[in-house]
Amino acid sequence: MKRWTLFLLLCVSCSCFAQENQSLDSLLCAIHDKDQSVRQRIQSVFLSGNRDSIMAASLQMNAVDQENQAVVFGILDKEGWPAGLCSLANSAIFLVIDHAALPAQEKYYPMVKEKADEGIIGKGDAATLQDRILMRKGEKQIYGTQTASVRKDDGTVYYLWPVENPDKLDELRKEVNLPPIADYIAIFKQQGMML
């Protein structure tokens, strides 16, 4: 009888965990979709050049980011990075951290690095966040993932944020599964942004 009771408790516990994980997966997947759709919208509005539309889209993006951060940071602070999530849910956690302010990026970067080392998220994701943190601190980046822009009278000029070791850049990018820098720059050129 004790074995059956223990077995039933174990089954109920596993079932509850699976349902809880599905619910968390669904929540995080919805956060991923909101994060990406607001960024796609701002990208198309940005190309239109209408300042009022750009400002409105930026405000909407900030509101979505704050909403997403409240949920994700609440989860991370309460229980750490949840195990057993689908890849899209794990990606959502990364994106929310990546799009946060510098203090939050620095706080959660160790978790991002750990999950990248475990293969839960891509090593390129951790490299991107590391570069973004360095750029925001005014330091040279390592992997060449970050760009910046300067407005001039004749338009906007984009450039690759300075890199710590340009001679080894492609080698470092390869270590974290990022494409060669020439391929990365070509992507920007395809989008009409000259680096």
Show where each model-derived region lies.
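Low-complexity, intrinsically disordered/propeptide-like segments
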Residues: 9-13, 27-31, 181
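Enrichment for repetitive, rod-forming helical segments
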Residues: 9-10, 41, 46, 180
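Mature-region segments of soluble proteins
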Residues: 105-182, 186-192
